[in-house]
Regions:
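Bacterial signal peptide processing site
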Residues: 25-28
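Short amphipathic alpha-helices in soluble, non-transmembrane regions
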Residues: 40, 78-90, 160-171, 218-226, ...
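Short edge beta-strands and adjacent turn/loop segments
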Residues: 46-67, 140-144, 149, 186, ...
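C-terminal motif of bacterial Sec signal peptides marking the signal peptidase cleavage site
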Residues: 19-23
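Long, acidic/polar, low-complexity amphipathic helices and coiled-coil-like
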Residues: 63-65, 80, 90-181
Length: 277
């Protein structure tokens, strides 16, 4: 049996441990780290805005993310300064109780992901500079696992197809080699090209996951569907076809048309809905 003094000592030890832990950092670690990110980045050169967000997964543990905004016409050298600083911040602050999900630089209509290693960031910046100097593209997201590129003009399947093929011609020499989360060699050759609806969200998208995986059958099906019924949304990749008709009444015929052209695709690989679904 514990003595009174033993119980008091145990309570004191617990209280001391709690005080010690609370002194180690913010109990709301994720949102706290996001606030710290915003404060620090807003004072740095070339940065005109900073936004952080975070989830507080457990007491003193969290998952923050952060984005800084720079001028759309920032020079390559100035962008290098910002990316290097972000990369160092990423390394210094991604530790035991904090699991940073991502950091990005917003440059006009583009989002450029930042990684922990300078060599990878240098390669991603070179890829980005190649993209933003090309009049084919008007915005997008550049990161290791996928390059998403917005194109301008009147939406059509032909325009999407030309942009997809052109993007591989434009960027093949600049794809970034890296090691994925499972330790396998990988390449930034997954590309999406898209037309955006007013307001900025993607409306019609072609995706290709590597130079050898062109979705020819799916493009043909999209072309036939486009000519058959009005569409409000479409996203097409190899073995994946999703579209929304503007009229719910067109769904059965649209579904039959696509399934008739993509025989052999799994049931869930083809999804046709009405825009109000």
């Amino acid at each position: 049996m514990k003595t009174r003094s033993g119980v008091v000592a145990a309570i004191a030890a617990i209280a001391l441990a709690a005080v010690t832990l609370s002194g180690c950092g913010n109990i709301d670690a994720g949102s706290g780290a996001a606030d710290d990110f915003e404060r620090f980045m807003s004072e740095q050169k070339h940065i005109i805005g900073a936004t952080g967000s975070g989830t507080n997964d457990l007491p003193w543990q969290g998952s923050p993310s952060g984005t800084v905004t720079v001028s759309a016409d920032i020079s390559a050298d100035e962008l290098e300064t910002v990316v290097d600083m972000l990369g160092e911040y990423y390394v210094d602050h991604d530790r035991g109780n904090l699991d940073w999900k991502r950091m990005d630089v917003s440059v006009g209509a583009y989002e450029l992901a930042v990684e922990k290693t300078k060599s990878t960031n240098d390669d991603l910046r070179a890829l980005f500079e190649e993209i933003r100097e090309n009049p084919r593209y008007t915005g997008g997201d550049i990161e290791l696992r996928e390059i998403r590129l917005e194109i301008d003009g009147e939406p059509s399947v032909d325009a999407l197809e030309r942009a997809l093929d052109g993007s591989y011609d434009d960027l093949a020499a600049h794809f970034v080699e890296y090691v994925d989360i499972e330790g396998r060699p990988a390449l930034t050759d997954a590309i999406s090209v898209y037309f955006a609806e007013p307001g900025g969200s993607d409306q019609f998208t072609l995706q290709q996951f590597g130079e050898e995986n062109r979705p020819d059958a799916e493009i043909a099906a999209l072309r036939a569907l486009w000519a058959s019924v009005p569409l409000g949304f479409a996203r097409v990749a190899e073995n994946d076809f999703y579209a929304q008709t503007t009229d719910e009444a067109d769904v059965p015929a649209a579904d039959a048309l696509v399934r008739g052209m993509l025989v052999g695709h799994e049931e869930g690989a083809i999804r046709i809905h009405g825009s109000d679904d």
